[in-house]
Amino acid sequence: MAAFFIVVASLAVALLLHWWFKRPSVKHIKGPPSLSFWLGHERVLRDQDNAGDLETKWRREYGTLFRMGGCFGQDVLVVCDPKALEHVFHPSHPYPKSKDAVFILGLFTGKGLGIVDTCLGETHHRQRKILNPAFSPAQLRNSQVIFQQCSDKLVNGIKESFAGTDDTVNVRDWTGKVTLDIIASFRYDFSTLDGQKTELGQAMRHLFTASQANPSALELILVALIRILPDSVLGLLRLVPTREIRQLISVGNMAKKTAREIMASHNEVQTPEGNGDLLDILARARSVGKMQDDEIEAQLMTLIIAGHETSGTSLTWLLYELAVHSEHQSIIRAELKQSNKYDSMPFLNAVIKESLRLHPVVHSLMHTAPHDDSLPLSGGKTLTIPKGQTLLCSAYLYNRLPCLWGDDAEEWNPARFLDKALPVSLGVYANLFALFNWSMKCRIMEMQTILANLILHFEFSLPDGCPEILRFPGSPVVVPVVKGKVHLGSQLPLRVRVLP
């Protein structure tokens, strides 16, 4: 009997080895030499000063698809090839998010649309169908009233904070306040623009920098374990006391508490089918059994954290670029004096598009091949990849490809969105590779309204001494930090002058 088990075990090992060595391999793909079996390139990517600099160097050397090392000797394909990205995100056969991306996002947003993949079929379709009316044209018009009210409070708050007519202001602090207060559309006022300090707002200010600055080798390895551990034991990692997991769970618990308070303060549905804001829609879905309480909490958590953080960060980078290129502020003011319809202002929209291109709020997205597949590449070639292959889909690199955007792809030039049609279409907005395409119209309207109000009332410029602004590496959201002051969290000091 023992001999029989030895034979069976040997046969199983032989079959496993045969499958392993016969499976498609990406070892032949060029890329930077791996620095460590245990850490690959994950440590050097976290240690770089400016997110994207190292990846840009590799892209110039190895092209729009290259191989880098992950933890435990894993091969990770870095992808910014337009054809390959179109294939990965195609709605008919989407690649799912990687297990570590889903796990990390789930810690602070729950199982809302932020992590429910299109490949999950019925769940994704059901959630999208329920939430779509919240982003209808009628609801967007209602939202614009809220955007305007909050942007007016923002303008008044900045003015009242001045001792004179100009001052150096941490713009990141104010953009965070206004985008959080816009959540007052839930009929739940955070009042941060009125000086109220909420526990959640304070925690989110340092959400990504505090938890992900200078990670130890052990912390990187523990997070990388998520990619290879079976789902049945992933929950145990919540008990692992890494800074990142501790911080994200803490913020997630605050967001969940806030989501419950929001729903508890909302009365039963009083609007007819097809009308009402997001809260009405979620309450209606709960009342008819289409959504459970944990799903509703997750949608609110996603909007509170992910929606607030992405919008606030995008506005911050936009104001930074307009401070650097201050001559563009006068062009926007001239447009605003001629029209009150934001969509009819070409330069206002061009600077928004250009800022989202240069500063995608999410640097990259980690996805996994659901099966052995042929990945189409630009130029007509294909690459065979194995099931389970990890792909790092880089929005940062794609949005700076010279073959798409021209020789000045890494420079600020809003005119590119005025002068020519774009050659391919990956994103739903201006060919940009961006997160949360399903709520992009709402996000753009929010940016238009706030930017217009700020530009009409203030002039932005770089402060004395011009501190160096860096893109914080290692964070899922690319937040600005001041060189040498990363420990203070996300910041953007600008000189702000009140216009007469």
Mark where each language-model region is:
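Cytochrome P450 heme-binding "Cys pocket" and the immediately downstream C-terminal segment
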Residues: L193, S326-H328, V428, M440-G484
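Short, small-residue alpha-helix embedded
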Residues: T310-A323, I450
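Conserved cytochrome P450 K-helix/beta-meander segment immediately N-terminal to the heme-binding cysteine loop
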Residues: C393-V424
